[in-house]
Amino acid sequence: MFTHYILNKNKFPVPCSDNVEWSNWMQENDRVVKRDYIGDILISTVFLGIDHSWGGCTPALFETMTFSKDGSPWDRTIMGRYNFWDEAIDGHDKAVQEISSYIGGQ
């Protein structure tokens, strides 16, 4: 079972058993999937490179989190974890919609 992954040229996760190769890839490549600001809230979706599924069938390798300086309920909130790049984009967009609706409803 692999815990470390890198992305191939098509942004598909592939297992990486060489820790040096993995570390170099993580340092040399842009891991940001999407990043948006809504007011002071940052919505960030990134490739983690490490399986966060806790033993799930498919590795959870991408994560959307929010960050806020104003102490809002969105500060350091994990909005979702995903298995693939396209799922991460969809999850990011849903997080943006959710936060936009929340802020617009205040």
Put a short name on every predicted segment:
Residues M1, L48-I78, K94, S101:
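Short aromatic-glycine-(Arg/Gly/Cys) micro-motifs in beta-strand/loop hairpins
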Residues N83-Y102:
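A short, charged, amphipathic alpha-helix used as a generic interaction element across diverse proteins
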Residues K11-C16, R76-N83:
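Short, exposed beta-strand "edge-strand" segments with a Pro/Gly-rich flavor and a Y/T-containing core
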Residues M1-F62:
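Short N-terminal "domain-start" leader segments
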Residues K9, K69, D86:
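Short, ordered coil/turn segments that flank beta-strands lining enzyme active or ligand-binding pockets
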